[in-house]
Swiss-Prot record:
Phosphorylated by host ERK. The phosphorylation triggers a structural change that enhances keratin binding and protein stability. Keywords: Early protein, Host cytoplasm, Host G2/M cell cycle arrest by virus, Host nucleus, Host-virus interaction, Modulation of host cell cycle by virus, Phosphoprotein. This is Protein E4. Coiled coil: none annotated. It is found in: Host cytoplasm; Host nucleus. Residues 1-204 are annotated as: Disordered.
Length: 240
């Protein structure tokens, strides 16, 4: 039979051997590729870090400069115009036409280039004084004003006939006063007395005579009404 206490020192000896034993060395890391240097940002290289190929001329000569290439397109330059040789001078530019002489309406900025093509002599016609749209020539197209219509005698604005002063004129005033009383009975006011030559004395005398006549007629009318009322009361008082 084995002693159980004999296993304990063996296990302890194995644990001590594991602690004292060194681990195996790690494998070296894989080699990394070499880093490419960053290209310097220069105006002669494009975005792909590739140098531009040297441009050669069409006939195999040295590369043309930028100014020569610009001149070769249409032969345009500071001394040559489009389609002209180097020896010919460019034609002068047409100057814009100025405003036509004389007063005229204001031109807007949008209509400026359109109206500049017109002849300066064909400026807008300025309307003369008194002319209106649709009526050229001022008062030439308008007919003269029509005279007012004459008033008839019934409206009361007709011509007034002057009556001579004296007894004949007074008789005429009396007849007019009688006619005025008849008009009062019908509901129309009496016509005003006509003036006599613009003299205040004659006018006052005619007005006074008319007032006297109207007062007499009024008294007669009142007296007749009173007589009729008395007769009416008498008829009512008498038995039938």
């Amino acid at each position: 039979m084995t002693d159980p206490n004999s296993k304990a020192p063996r296990l302890q000896g194995r644990q001590e051997d594991k602690q004292t034993q060194t681990p195996p060395p790690r494998p070296p890391p894989p080699p990394q590729p070499p880093l490419t240097p960053r290209p310097d940002s220069s105006p002669h290289q494009n975005s792909h870090n590739k140098p531009k190929p040297e441009e050669e001329g069409t006939d195999g000569g040295p590369p043309a400069s930028q100014g020569d290439r610009k001149r070769s397109k249409g032969d345009q330059g500071p001394d040559t115009g489009p389609g002209l040789g180097p020896g010919r001078a460019p034609s002068p530019k047409p100057t814009p036409l100025g405003p036509p002489p004389g007063p005229g309406p204001r031109r807007s900025a949008r209509l400026g280039p359109l109206q500049a093509d017109r002849d300066p002599g064909e400026g807008p016609q300025v309307p003369a004084e008194g002319e209106v749209e649709g009526h050229p020539g001022g008062d030439q197209g308008h007919p003269p004003p029509t005279p007012p219509a004459p008033h008839n005698g019934h409206s009361g604005h007709g011509p007034k006939v002057q009556q001579p002063e004296g007894p004949e004129g007074r008789e005429g005033h009396e007849e007019g006063a009688v006619g005025g009383d008849c008009g009062d009975e019908e509901g129309h006011p009496p016509p005003p007395p006509p003036p006599t030559n613009g003299h205040e004395g004659g006018l006052l005398s005619s007005v006074a005579s008319l007032l006297v006549k109207w007062e007499g007629h009024f008294d007669q009318l009142v007296q007749s009404i009173q007589d009729d009322l008395e007769d009416y009361w008498k008829k009512l008082a008498t038995p039938q």
